[in-house]
């Protein structure tokens, strides 16, 4: 798919894309208790999660999920490009007992499994440290010690796994990256009857009394941020509906404050994110280690600021769908933006954004970044269907917001 974008003023009302983080967690929750996800719009990654729970023994009828029998581990599981589903599923498989070959697409085959292999050493074996790999064995005790720097998703997976078997303890070896996603998992499960506490670098999972989840999948701030930044750079005003109220911990919702710090009017009221453009934007310095998915969103506004933007905590960007340190920088450069990076940071300078052409490196957020830049000066994006990984309505929504977009 080729998308051609002409300069446009983005404004109006739009529903936030459904949260991939919440969507996958709520689908996996059906392993613990039945779920009815009223407004579920499956993206590629959510479809992977649905397929996994079905193969483990959950009955799925439309948006209704119910576990009707003992869970089983199949001989083969395919995870597409969904790293979240993969990393949360391996701990679950390990407590059930597993003799399964797991695989994924070319992007997932590049993702390391080192932390989970080390954590399960002595109980569960892996035939390879990269996909495809065969996993065999069963966790011998309801305790695990795992490095926290590779991915918080393994830790979320163990929270689910120990909730499934009546309790357990997780000791995290610092540093702990993306801690906000661990808080998200704990808060979600505790709201549904879980009994989970985090003290320092330890998580204690006690037997829970889980209740069915019947409700909506909340909106995703990180995905919605590209609508917001498109409006900001083009001089518009936008209301993004169906977002969750801001919790008392940092996370993807922190983008609301980051855009405010950069000079835009940005706030949440009554489950709506209201964003208005500003005559002047300014650069910020931000560490994204706890919310790496916000790096492309921040980068989308940075060239239009009056001072440089410095993005730190970028280590985990290198093992996303693409090496985002490189692909963010290359994408900005193709639109005439001055950008520099090293091992520790990306520096984006105020620049005159020009029309650009990007071939999506099979990374949804890079295509979304390119779209924001294009609304200012025009641009074309090849392989634009990559947005389906997280938000299949992306281009349709932007057209509804006055985006002058031609899809070929």
Curated annotation (Swiss-Prot):
Ligand binding (phosphoenolpyruvate): 20, 111, 153, 324, 365, 389
Pathway: Metabolic intermediate biosynthesis; chorismate biosynthesis
Gene Ontology CC entries for this record: cytoplasm
InterPro entries referenced in this protein's UniProt entry, alphabetically: Enolpyruvate_Tfrase_dom, Enolpyruvate_Tfrase_sf, EPSP_synthase, EPSP_synthase_CS, RNA3'P_cycl/enolpyr_Trfase_a/b
Residue pairs linked by disulfide bridges in the UniProt entry: none
Catalytic residue list: 293 (proton acceptor)
GO biological process, one term: aromatic amino acid family biosynthetic process
Parts forming coiled coils: none
Entry's EC annotation: 2.5.1.19
Major site of localization recorded for this protein: cytoplasm
Domain of life (superkingdom): Archaea
Subunit description: Monomer.
The protein, known as: 3-phosphoshikimate 1-carboxyvinyltransferase
Organism: Sulfurisphaera tokodaii (strain DSM 16993 / JCM 10545 / NBRC 100140 / 7)
Lineage, uppermost ranks: Archaea, Thermoproteota, Thermoprotei, Sulfolobales, Sulfolobaceae
């Amino acid at each position: 798919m080729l998308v051609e974008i002409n300069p446009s003023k983005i404004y109006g009302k739009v529903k936030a894309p459904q949260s991939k983080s919440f969507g996958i967690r709520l689908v996996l929750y059906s392993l613990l208790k039945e779920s009815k996800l009223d407004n579920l719009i499956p993206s590629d990654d959510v479809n992977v999660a649905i397929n996994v729970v079905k193969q483990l023994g959950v009955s799925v009828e439309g948006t209704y999920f119910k576990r009707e029998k003992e869970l089983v581990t199949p001989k083969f599981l395919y995870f597409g490009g969904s790293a979240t589903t993969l990393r949360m599923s391996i701990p679950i498989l390990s407590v059930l007992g597993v003799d399964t070959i797991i695989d994924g697409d070319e992007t997932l085959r590049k993702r390391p499994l080192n932390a989970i292999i080390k954590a399960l050493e002595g109980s569960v074996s892996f035939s390879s440290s990269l996909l495809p790999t065969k996993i065999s064995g069963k966790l011998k005790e309801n305790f695990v010690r795992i490095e926290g720097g590779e991915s918080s998703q393994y830790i979320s997976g163990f929270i689910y796994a120990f909730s499934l078997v009546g309790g357990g303890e997780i000791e995290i070896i610092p540093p702990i990256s993306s801690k906000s996603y661990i808080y998200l998992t704990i808060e979600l499960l505790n709201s549904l009857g879980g009994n989970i506490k985090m003290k320092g670098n330890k998580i204690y999972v006690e037997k829970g009394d889980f209740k069915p989840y019947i409700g909506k999948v909340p909106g995703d701030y990180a995905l919605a941020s590209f609508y917001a930044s498109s409006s900001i750079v083009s001089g518009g005003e936008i209301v993004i509906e169906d977002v969750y109220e801001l919790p008392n911990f940092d996370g993807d919702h922190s983008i609301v404050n980051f855009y405010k710090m950069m000079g835009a009017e940005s706030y949440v009221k009554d489950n709506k994110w209201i964003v208005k453009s500003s005559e002047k934007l300014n650069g910020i310095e931000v560490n994204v280690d706890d919310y790496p998915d916000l790096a492309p969103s921040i980068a989308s506004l940075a060239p239009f600021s009056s001072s440089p933007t410095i993005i730190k905590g970028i280590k985990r960007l290198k093992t996303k769908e693409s090496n985002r340190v490189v692909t963010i920088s290359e994408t900005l450069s193709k639109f005439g933006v001055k950008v520099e990076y090293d091992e520790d940071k990306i520096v984006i300078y105020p620049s005159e954004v020009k029309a650009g052409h990007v071939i999506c490196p099979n990374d949804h957020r890079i295509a979304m970044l390119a779209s924001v830049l294009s609304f200012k000066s025009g641009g074309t994006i090849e392989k634009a269907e990559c947005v389906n990984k997280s938000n299949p309505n992306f281009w349709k929504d932007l057209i509804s917001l006055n985006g002058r977009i031609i899809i070929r």
